[in-house]
A protein has these predicted regions:
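Zn2+-dependent metallopeptidase catalytic core
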Residues: 2-6, 70
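Metalloprotease/metallohydrolase-associated module, dominated by Zn2+-dependent proteases
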Residues: 16-26, 30-32, 37-39, 91-170
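Short pre-active-site segment immediately N-terminal to the catalytic Zn-binding motif
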Residues: 23, 27-28, 36-74, 116-117
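Activation segment
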Residues: 39, 46, 81-82, 129
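Short, solvent-exposed loop/turn segments at secondary-structure junctions
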Residues: 41-44, 78, 87-88, 132-134
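Acidic active-site catalytic centers that drive phospho-/nucleotidyl reactions
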Residues: 75-76, 122
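Catalytic Zn2+-binding segment of zinc metalloproteases
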Residues: 76-95
């Protein structure tokens, strides 16, 4: 984990169990190309999933879809593709993530976890984590849907977030 490669060099995000890193209701966290989980059992389950992220490589049967798809791992994979779209750098991705988080904290009086729930990166990931073909929309594999959310005002993001609910989806 401490010798992270560029996001474009990461084909499959390995999962590790570091339970004290995750607070609250978070199921997992992306950390420089790895997925941090609550338990070793979750980490092993995510590590057993086959890394196939292009629908052209996927079998048509839904039973085969279960061999590689899990919403939480896909959510974290969307973060990997977002990092590729931010100068292909984990540091740039986390810097932008922090800036969006800090900006959204102004809405904490209305929404207790606003820094997280109104973050454009999280909004894109939550809105699309149940669509296993979402990343196919981007020919170069870089998820850029977060840019649409970033152009919105905080009020627009607040109302747009009602289309999904991170607490219900996690």
């Amino acid at each position: 984990m401490l010798t992270a490669r560029r996001p474009s060099h990461t084909l499959d995000m390995r999962s590790v169990s570091i339970p004290f890193w995750l607070r609250g209701n978070y199921d997992a966290m992306t950390f420089f190309g790895s997925i941090v989980t609550h338990s070793q059992a979750e980490a092993e389950r995510y590590n057993q999933l086959t890394p196939q992220y292009q629908s052209s490589k996927l079998p048509a049967q839904s039973s085969k879809l279960k061999e590689w798809y899990h919403p939480v791992k896909y959510h974290e994979t969307i973060h990997l593709r977002q990092a590729q779209s931010v100068h292909n750098s984990w540091l740039c991705f986390y810097w932008k993530y922090f800036l969006f988080w800090f900006q959204a904290r102004r809405a904490n009086r209305i929404l207790p976890n606003a820094g997280y729930e109104l973050n454009p990166f999280e909004m894109e990931a939550y809105a699309n984590m149940y669509n296993p073909y979402y990343l196919d929309r981007f020919p170069d594999g870089r998820a850029t849907g977060w840019k649409d959310y970033a152009r919105m005002t905080l009020a627009q993001r607040f109302y747009a977030r009602r289309k999904y609910s991170p607490k219900e989806n996690s």
